[in-house]
Swiss-Prot record:
UniProt keyword annotations, A-Z: Chromosome, Metal-binding, Nucleus, Phosphoprotein, Repeat, RNA-binding, Zinc, Zinc-finger
Described function: May play a role in chromatin organization.
Zinc finger (RanBP2-type): 355-384, 581-610
Protein's name according to its UniProt entry: Putative RNA-binding protein involved in heterochromatin assembly
Species of the source: Saccharomyces cerevisiae (strain ATCC 204508 / S288c)
GO CC, one annotated term: nucleus
Region forming the signal peptide: none
Gene that encodes the chain: NRP1
Length: 719
């Protein structure tokens, strides 16, 4: 067994890409692994100069192979390097491909010991050395002139020489060529490190596990793997940059994963510098990751890109600049990816890293600074840690209803971490306080049924999510009591009864709950009476109670709130607080304030309204609907009686129909849908029965079963 100490000298012309550097000199030494005797003397170290004219790289490799086999014959050997591990693994194979020749097997897929890595392994087995290294690092950092370099310099040659007690003779500058000096130093460190390995732990871990590219490529080919390992990437590389880089070479990967920075010294969010896990890389300020391809053949072809450079724009620094890193691509496998899954994360979509306290608007997804109390785009109030109410996701509508009732009755916020833990998709939208910037939000209409008045209305209450599944946002938010919106996941989007139940509970807390079969459920009716009364006092300009015993104690108090914009149309009360600019428009369905450039509503996806009449565009509830019993509703008002028009419990002799806020105001179809008729449901109370387009009048009735909305109602809407 022999060690072949190999050091390469590289020449790089100025103003040329890094992947155009060339091997200029090759120096090597052969050491017997048992006796630690060097084959060549200090004054006769072999060196092969590669100048490109008289000596090409191909002829230099032939000479190197001949000299090695002349000394060791057929004996086993392994490469060792202190400064040239990167060039052996990356630069040498890349230049051989550029020159059009094939390296020998031990250089094409080398087994190499990196002495920096072996020294770190040896220090782990000797805790006293770790304390000594830490003291040295602290002393260096105390020196102001070298504090930055010392903090980033992980390859301290003086440290390894002093700890291993390597005796290096002082030589006059220029007396010995640099390549020989490097080779002599590497050989001395190897011999001294080998002598220091005295404990059983050292014998097991130090100088026993080289970087074995041959084993990696063999496992890659046998498994027909589609996964490659990427190393030496710029620290803030984004997924789009990687996709563009691979696309220019004609390949399209299907997935990217980056290795999280788990080094304690560089885990600070204010530190833009990332320490690479591999000490041999050319740029320590770099990251690594994995790339997945569609086929094994495509991944095999991409291995030829090993050693090519990639450009990245460092934007999150005081001096933005473009950096160039030479990318290392090595074969990998699914087994390696599975073992590393706990430290893997997707590459960022953007270079704009969120700062502590930044928050994403739950209404439009806009990223806001911490100091903003409302969304800069849509004026939606900022949530806070103590204000976010969450509920666990559940496919069973009865369980979802119980969770909603429990949350309303308790009046307290649940722990956001519990919701994120129980959410089937990890709930990235819930963790707005953890500085997680979600990807660009998309509104996936494929998850919704055919657009009907009911399904469209329910879509108004659904915020887009990364997983494509809607998050139902409660509409009883009001600036008066600083309650943040609730989030709830529900998979039963296609069940109209479930949607009605969710919508009505979120808006008015009607206790006549509906199960999946359309049957009424009167549970918890007494528990929510007080909440309904207080809730209607504080939020709504009308009072609705669907319990069998109607409570009208709060009717006279609601007229005072008619000018407070608490009707909660959509999610922003009377709409957005943003001032209207030229061209801005309000959605005719959900009254969302859209910018002029938007051709569809950002909230519900509805088309841009073409009506010029504000009264037809904005579905506001007339204040005459509310107030004392002597006030009569106007013709434009919508009346809903959840008690079947009965005057039971009334003491003033007036009809209930003119006093209750219409629930169906929030279910008005868009104008484009008022020109045709459609049939909804089959008369079993599970959906709307009839939609008539005569003067945009809507006749909602229930045949045979009146459990869909309390006791049923008839209503008409005028735009």
């Amino acid at each position: 067994m022999h060690y072949v100490v190999l050091e390469l000298q590289v020449a790089h012309l100025p103003d040329t890409p890094k992947d155009q550097c060339r091997i200029a000199n090759i120096a090597f030494q052969i050491v017997n692994a048992e006796t630690l005797v060097c084959h060549y003397g200090t004054n006769s170290l072999p060196s092969i100069e590669v100048n490109g004219t008289t000596k090409s790289l191909e002829s230099a490799m032939v000479q190197l192979d001949k000299d090695i086999h002349d000394v060791i014959g057929n004996d086993d050997f392994v490469l060792v390097s202190l400064y040239s591990t990167w060039h052996i693994r990356v630069t040498l194979p890349r230049q051989a491909r550029d020159d059009g020749f094939i390296l020998t097997s031990y250089l094409q897929h080398p087994k190499v010991f990196d002495l920096w890595k072996e020294f770190d392994r040896w220090c782990v087995n000797h805790p006293e050395i770790l304390g000594q290294k830490k003291a040295i690092s602290n002393n260096n950092c105390n020196t102001k002139s070298i504090s930055i370099n010392a903090a980033k310099n992980t390859k301290d040659l003086d440290e390894i020489v002093r700890i291993l007690e390597v005796s290096i003779p002082t030589e006059e500058a220029g007396s010995v060529p640099e390549i020989y000096s490097l080779l002599k130093r590497t050989t001395d460190i190897l011999i001294q490190l080998h002598k220091k390995c005295t404990s059983p732990e050292d014998m097991e871990s130090v100088l026993t596990k080289p970087y074995d590219s041959h084993t990696d490529i063999r496992a890659f080919l046998q498994e027909k793997s589609k996964i490659l390992y990427m190393n030496n990437l710029p620290p803030d590389t984004t997924q789009s940059e990687l996709e563009s880089w691979f696309t220019q070479y004609g390949v399209r990967p299907v997935g990217f994963w980056t290795v999280k920075n788990i080094v304690e010294d560089t885990s600070n969010v204010n530190n833009n510098w990332s320490l690479n896990n591999s000490p041999y890389v050319e740029d320590q300020d770099s990251i690594s990751g994995f790339v997945v391809f569609q086929t094994h053949e495509e991944a095999t072809e991409v291995l030829a890109l090993n050693g090519r450079s990639i450009l990245s724009n460092l934007a999150n620094t005081k001096q933005p600049r473009v950096v160039e890193h030479v990318l290392e691509l090595q074969p990998s496998s699914t087994g390696v990816l599975d073992k590393a899954q706990e430290i893997l994360s997707p590459f960022p979509q953007s270079k704009n890293k969120p700062r502590p306290g930044d928050w994403n608007c739950p209404s439009c997804g806009f990223s806001n600074f911490q100091r903003r109390t409302a969304c800069f785009r849509c004026s939606f109030p900022a949530p806070s840690n103590s204000q976010i109410h969450t509920a666990n996701s559940n496919n069973n509508v009865n369980s979802s209803r119980n969770n909603l009732n429990n949350r309303v009755n308790s009046g307290s916020s649940s722990n956001i971490s519990n919701t994120a833990a129980n959410h089937p998709y990890g709930a990235p939208e819930f963790n707005m306080i953890a500085n997680n910037t979600p990807a660009a939000l998309t509104y996936n209409r494929a998850h919704f049924p055919a657009i009907t008045p009911l399904s469209r209305q329910n879509s108004l209450n659904m915020a887009p999510s990364n997983s494509g599944s809607p998050i139902i946002i409660a509409d009883h938010f009001s600036g008066n009591n600083n309650i943040a919106p609730n989030y709830r996941y529900n998979n039963n989007i296609n069940n109209n009864n479930n949607n009605i139940n969710n919508m009505t509970n979120n808006r008015y807390n009607i206790n006549n709950n509906i199960n999946g079969n359309g049957n009424g459920n009167g549970n918890n009716s007494n528990n929510n009476n007080n909440h309904n009364n207080n809730h209607n006092n504080n939020h709504h300009n009308g009072s609705i109670n669907s319990n069998s015993n109607t409570n009208n104690n709060n009717n006279n108090n609601n007229g005072n709130n008619s000018n407070n914009c608490n009707s909660n149309i959509g999610m922003g009360g009377c709409g957005s607080n943003m001032p209207f600019r030229a061209g801005d428009w309000k959605c005719s369905t959900c009254t969302y304030h859209n910018f002029a450039k938007n051709v569809v509503c950002l909230r519900c996806g509805g088309p841009k309204s073409i009506s010029g009449d504000a009264s037809e565009t904005n579905h506001y509830i007339d204040s005459s609907t509310f107030g004392p019993a002597s006030r009569t509703p106007s013709n434009n008002n919508i009346s809903v009686n959840t008690n079947g028009g009965s005057n039971a419990g009334r003491t003033d002799g007036n009809d209930n129909k003119g006093r209750d806020i219409s629930l169906m105001e929030f279910m008005s179809p868009p104008l484009s849908m008022a020109t045709k008729s459609m049939k909804e449901g089959d008369g079993n109370g599970s959906s709307f029965n009839e939609f008539k387009s005569d003067k945009a009048n809507v006749n909602f009735s229930n045949v045979g079963d009146n459990s869909a909305f309390g006791n049923g109602f008839n209503s008409s809407i005028r735009w």
